[in-house]
Swiss-Prot record:
Biological function: Catalyzes the oxidation of 5,10-methylenetetrahydrofolate to 5,10-methenyltetrahydrofolate and then the hydrolysis of 5,10-methenyltetrahydrofolate to 10-formyltetrahydrofolate.
PROSITE patterns (alphabetical): THF_DHG_CYH_2 (PS00767)
EC number: 1.5.1.5, 3.5.4.9
Organism: Oleidesulfovibrio alaskensis (strain ATCC BAA-1058 / DSM 17464 / G20) (Desulfovibrio alaskensis)
Positions that bind NADP(+): 164-166, 193, 234
HAMAP family hit by this protein: THF_DHG_CYH
Chemical reaction(s) catalysed: (6R)-5,10-methylene-5,6,7,8-tetrahydrofolate + NADP(+) = (6R)-5,10-methenyltetrahydrofolate + NADPH; (6R)-5,10-methenyltetrahydrofolate + H2O = (6R)-10-formyltetrahydrofolate + H(+)
Protein's name in the database: Bifunctional protein FolD
Family listed: Belongs to the tetrahydrofolate dehydrogenase/cyclohydrolase family.
Metabolic or biological pathway: One-carbon metabolism; tetrahydrofolate interconversion
Length: 286
């Protein structure tokens, strides 16, 4: 069984980006710049933002975190986004979700310049993904694809099952898996709460991707022997953090599996850095 180590892979990605940034920084005239907007004091969001700041520093990216009161108005938040859109030294804008009640997250995401939408959630970038055109890809599914590629695990010609249909993970991941390319070209089935005989669908998967937000939902009897299992879920339980997959028993059946934590979480942040550096290169012409 291969443990798909997202933490180590993400560290390698950061190191590669740092070398790239160091080599091009003089020509560009500045380092890449990422702006992170955090509204309110949600503890989990604060941890995520700190992790992103540390990762940026490792990769040679200058980050600015804008920590805004939960009492901010929609207009104030929109004005902040507009100001960051206008700044030449900012290559990427990330709006940390979820937003406090009363704020329209979709409207805010749509106000971010698509050329700075390094989270990949703007309708323009989602549309480009659907059409197979170049653009920023959502970070979590793109991180999943990078992890598969780094371990030379190609789903091409295989049956891939995606549990979950969210706009953040399930939908874009299904599109990426079914696209043309050496680490795509899968036959994809998307499952959700209304899927009949969900367990049987899972048992037929050569590649099983789980992103439903239910701790230890996928058990060993739902997994085809030798399948590759990617657990995107992270859930807080009384015993600590747990994924959507019952890791211990499933790891005895799968040929490769991601741990939680240390699997897809670090890869999500790594992809954010990849997108930011790509934006910087394009905007600076290097």
């Amino acid at each position: 069984m291969i443990l798909l180590d997202g933490k180590a892979t993400a560290a390698a990605v950061r190191e590669e980006l740092k070398k790239d940034v160091d080599a091009l920084k003089d020509r560009a005239g500045r380092a890449p710049g990422l702006a992170v907007i955090l509204v309110g004091d949600d503890p989990a969001s604060q941890v995520y933002v700190r992790n992103k700041e540390r990762a940026c520093a490792d990769a040679g990216i200058r980050s600015e975190a804008f920590r805004i009161s939960a009492q901010t108005t929609q207009q104030e938040l929109e004005e902040r986004i507009a100001a960051l859109n206008a700044r030449e030294d900012i290559d990427g804008i990330l709006l940390q979700l979820p937003l406090p009640a009363g704020l329209d997250s979709q409207r805010c995401l749509e106000l971010i310049d698509p050329a700075k939408d390094v989270d990949g959630f703007h309708p323009v970038n989602m549309g480009k993904l659907t059409l197979g055109l170049p653009g920023f890809r959502p970070c979590t599914p793109a991180g999943v694809m990078t992890l598969l590629e780094r371990y030379n695990l190609s789903p091409a010609g295989k049956k891939a099952v995606v549990l979950g249909r969210s706009n953040i993970v399930g939908k874009p991941l299904a599109l990426m898996l079914g696209a043309s390319g050496p680490f795509a070209n899968a036959t994809v089935t998307v499952c959700h709460s209304r899927t009949p005989d969900l367990a049987q669908q899972c048992r037929e998967a050569d590649f099983l991707f789980v992103a439903i937000g239910r701790a230890n939902f996928v058990t060993a009897d739902m997994v085809k022997p030798g399948a590759v299992v990617v657990d995107v879920g992270i859930n807080r339980t009384e015993n600590g953090l747990a994924g959507d997959v019952d890791f211990g028993p499933v790891s005895k059946v799968a040929s490769a599996i991601t741990p939680v934590p240390g699997g897809i979480g670090p890869m999500t942040i790594a992809q954010l850095l990849v997108n930011t550096v790509a934006s910087w290169k394009k905007r600076c012409g290097v």
